[in-house]
Amino acid sequence: MAGTGKTVTRVDLCEAVYQKVGLSRTESSAFVELVLKEITDCLERGETVKLSSFGSFMVRKKGQRIGRNPKTGTEVPISPRRVMVFKPSAILKQRINGQQANGKMNGESAPSEFSAETE
């Protein structure tokens, strides 16, 4: 599943569970579907879904406001609605930016406590 520009699908997630966990393909598919359904159900109820070291999915209410049609410039009322928001954890942000949890770039060695400088 690694790579740039690739979209990961349910099938990809099921295959990863199959390869890494050892469940059958049918069980892997059922497992992924169950997890996604549970997340969806929680969000539908307005609950926040917090996944440690990954991030939080939450539902926010947006009030009614006036928007503008970009083609005509006409003002258009936008109805109140709920939107889903994802807030990544600090750990996920660091990993995406190629950093380890200690703030170092991946591949950089951490300074040794016992290194001595000679002049």
Curated annotation (Swiss-Prot):
Gene Ontology molecular function: any one: structural constituent of chromatin
Stretches for region Disordered: 96-119
Alphabetically ordered keywords of this record: DNA recombination, DNA-binding, Transcription, Transcription regulation, Translation regulation
Protein name: Integration host factor subunit alpha
S-S bonds: none
Family of this protein: Belongs to the bacterial histone-like protein family.
Organism domain of life: Bacteria
Listed NCBIfam families: himA, PRK00285.1
UniProt-listed InterPro entries: Hist_DNA-bd (IPR000119), Histone-like_DNA-bd_CS (IPR020816), IHF-like_DNA-bd_dom_sf (IPR010992), IHF_alpha (IPR005684)
Signal peptide extent: none
A GO term from the CC aspect: cytosol
GO biological process: DNA recombination; positive regulation of metabolic process; regulation of DNA-templated transcription; regulation of translation
Subunit structure: Heterodimer of an alpha and a beta chain.
Free-text function comment from the UniProt entry: This protein is one of the two subunits of integration host factor, a specific DNA-binding protein that functions in genetic recombination as well as in transcriptional and translational control.
Keyword DNA-binding in annotation: yes
